[in-house]
């Protein structure tokens, strides 16, 4: 530790106004000195554990379990603490109890013959485990994580050693009293939640909370209660954010995807979006149309034929509306350079064909009852009325708006954190691997400046309610971020939604990826990106999601000699046959980086009843010889700045530039 040079009085005088404000918080040499000592001590603690998860896609059961077991961290802690002193079945039961304390206790109360003994043994084990997971934090930080009902008792137990002879009776009496007064269950629930909280210091979600899974709103509700979280928006998140902002094209996309996968629970049950007007509209216009190409993909869903027919009609109806709304944006924003996606005017209804890239293709569906061949991108009166009703539903959904505000306040397009660069999709590149220049708002941008600009525009889409022009541009940009050719979230040249519905030729379905994906294994590309984002290439990593890792085909999630890590979570069941696993998560603790691959999760019910955990295997990517400390982190840098400021305050006190408060005044 280097103390502030007292001879630099001119710097202190320049900062005197700020130091006087700081003196309100630390009104004496004694209080400022104590805080410096505390902060300096914190710098020497081990860094907290970071947990990285990506591409959840609404699969709330798998995600909930992953959050509770911290990608196997809790199980490893149990192994570290109890080793061979516990049977494997006991370790498994202890882990399940920590993950799901309320539900597991209900089962144990029904099956355990000597509940009092079980309570005593379990309490000792949980306290011992909690002592270990809390040991890397200050008492103050641990105290803040404790539930108010048991804060004093847990703190006492954590800071006492049960094997110390002089305190053994005191320690044992606390545990016995907890059992005697019938508070053991509540205490077990409380301390299990504390263990869950302390085992991970920071949670990073690298995009795509939303998509086809049935419980995105459940996931966000859980995340909003997390003690420390950041989110890097994914393309599926941004389209929902655009929908909540009132972007009609985004609303149509969100509904279309939900119908495509027969997942209406998030829309209807989660957010109270009224889809009855869409159902009525679809039945009126597509009554005689079987909408064969719009049948929902019903993975793990048992739908009757009537439901499938209705969903298919709704699916087709909103798809046509989507293409019309997107056409309006493309025409309104020539700088997006997406004219090739204007396809409705290329349809020859009489011939049943589509003109695409100077070729004529036969349409496999030629029923377009709402299409005006003279003005194909104009909504008819019924469509306009429907879109207005749907938009009102999205804008006035209290829960949706609350969740989207959470995504804005805790999220961004990218994040630099502890020398790592986190983003969901890609950094747009040219074919030669150089950063691609994109013109937006008459500015030519690339790399970091491009992402910074897009981040600001995404916020304007939602928050610029009093500036209609800026808000409209922002909303159009939200749609562009969803499917635009230079979108860092989409990462492809075009989205071939229309072709997949209406053309048989598979070649027209192809979506060419940005050259970024070709260069992901190139260390030079990673170094270029690190330099662009002002990171040290020797000590940094890119942590990326979006594209599932095809482990089944031998693909490795570790790219560019460990500089780039792809952790698409693989939660989405539709991708698991392609990937062969349920994806990857990443743990970054004081010892280094651990990449964990996961097998598919069965269910929360089986986890509770049978103790089934997600089968995982862990690869140590990097192991440091000496543990990383808070000193080596971004938080450490902030603490060092605080220490520097407090040292200046000490000098100001000692030189008489600021007067200390009277000790009596401080006390009373």
From Swiss-Prot:
- Which GO BP terms sit in this record? gluconeogenesis
> By its UniProt entry, which Pfam families does this protein fall under?
FBPase_2 (PF06874)
* Source taxon at top rank: Bacteria
Kindly state which keywords UniProt assigns to this record, in alphabetical order. Answer: Carbohydrate metabolism, Hydrolase, Manganese
Q: What is its EC number?
A: 3.1.3.11
The answer to whether the entry has keyword Hydrolase is yes
Family, per the entry?
A: Belongs to the FBPase class 3 family.
What name appears for this protein in its UniProt entry? Fructose-1,6-bisphosphatase class 3
Q: Which organism is it from?
A: Clostridium botulinum (strain Langeland / NCTC 10281 / Type F)
Q: Which gene encodes it?
A: fbp
């Amino acid at each position: 530790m280097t103390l502030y040079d007292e001879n630099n009085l001119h710097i202190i005088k320049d900062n005197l106004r700020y130091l006087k404000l700081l003196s309100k918080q630390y009104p004496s040499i004694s209080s400022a000195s104590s805080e410096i000592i505390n902060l300096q001590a914190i710098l020497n603690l081990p860094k907290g554990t970071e947990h990285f998860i990506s591409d959840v896609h609404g699969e709330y059961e798998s995600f909930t379990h992953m959050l509770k077991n911290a990608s196997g961290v809790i199980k490893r802690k149990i192994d570290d603490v109890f080793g061979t002193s516990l049977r494997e079945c006991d370790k498994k039961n202890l882990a399940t109890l920590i993950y799901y304390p309320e539900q597991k206790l209900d089962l144990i109360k029904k099956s355990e013959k000597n509940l009092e003994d079980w309570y005593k043994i379990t309490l000792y084990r949980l306290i011992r485990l909690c002592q270990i997971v809390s040991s890397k934090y200050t008492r103050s930080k641990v105290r803040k994580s404790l539930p108010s009902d048991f804060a004093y008792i847990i703190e006492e137990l954590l800071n006492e050693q049960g094997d110390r002879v002089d305190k053994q009776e005191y320690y044992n009496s606390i545990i016995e009293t907890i059992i005697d007064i019938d508070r053991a269950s509540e205490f077990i629930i409380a301390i299990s939640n504390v263990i869950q909280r302390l085992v991970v210091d920071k949670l990073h979600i690298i995009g795509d909370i939303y998509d086809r899974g049935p419980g995105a709103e459940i996931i966000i509700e859980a995340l909003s209660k997390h003690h420390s979280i950041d989110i890097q928006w994914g393309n599926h998140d941004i389209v929902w954010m655009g929908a909540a902002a009132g972007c009609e094209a985004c609303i149509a996309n969100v509904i279309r995807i939900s119908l495509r996968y027969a997942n209406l629970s998030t829309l209807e049950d989660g957010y109270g979006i009224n889809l009855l007007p869409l159902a009525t509209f679809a039945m009126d216009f597509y009554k005689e149309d079987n909408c064969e190409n719009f049948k929902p993909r019903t993975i793990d869903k048992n739908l009757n034929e009537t439901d499938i027919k209705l969903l298919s009609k709704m699916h087709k109806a909103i798809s046509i509306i989507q293409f019309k709304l997107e056409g309006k944006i493309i025409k309104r924003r020539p700088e997006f350079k997406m004219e090739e996606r204007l396809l409705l005017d290329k349809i020859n209804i009489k011939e049943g064909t589509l003109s695409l890239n100077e070729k004529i293709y036969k349409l496999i569906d030629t029923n377009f009852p709402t299409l005006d061949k003279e003005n194909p991108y104009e909504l008819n009166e019924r469509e306009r009325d429907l879109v207005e009703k749907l938009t009102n539903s999205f804008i006035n959904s209290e829960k949706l708006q609350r969740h989207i505000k959470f995504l804005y306040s805790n999220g961004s397009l990218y994040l630099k954190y502890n020398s790592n660069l986190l983003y969901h999709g890609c950094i747009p590149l040219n074919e030669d691997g150089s950063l691609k220049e994109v013109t937006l708002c008459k500015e030519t941008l690339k790399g970091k400046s491009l992402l910074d600009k897009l981040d600001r525009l995404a916020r304007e889409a939602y928050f610029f309610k009093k500036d209609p022009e800026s808000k409209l541009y922002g909303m159009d940009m939200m749609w562009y971020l969803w499917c635009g050719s230079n979108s860092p979230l989409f990462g492809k040249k075009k989205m071939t939604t229309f072709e997949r519905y209406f053309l048989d030729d598979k070649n027209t379905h192809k979506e060419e990826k940005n050259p970024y994906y070709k260069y992901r294994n190139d260390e030079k590309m990673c170094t270029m990106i690190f330099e662009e984002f002002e990171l040290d290439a020797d000590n940094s990593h890119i942590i990326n999601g979006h594209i599932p890792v095809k482990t089944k085909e031998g693909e490795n999630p570790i790219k560019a000699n460990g500089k780039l890590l792809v952790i698409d979570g693989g939660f989405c069941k539709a991708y698991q046959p392609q990937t062969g696993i349920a994806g990857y998560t990443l743990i970054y603790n004081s010892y280094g980086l651990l990449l964990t691959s996961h097998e598919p999760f069965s269910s929360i019910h089986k986890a509770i009843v049978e103790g089934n955990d997600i089968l995982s295997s862990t690869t140590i990517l990097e192991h440091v010889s000496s543990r990383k400390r808070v000193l080596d982190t971004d938080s450490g840098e902030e603490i060092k700045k605080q220490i520097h400021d407090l040292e200046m305050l000490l000098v100001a006190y000692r030189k008489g530039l600021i007067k200390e408060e009277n000790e009596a005044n401080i006390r009373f």
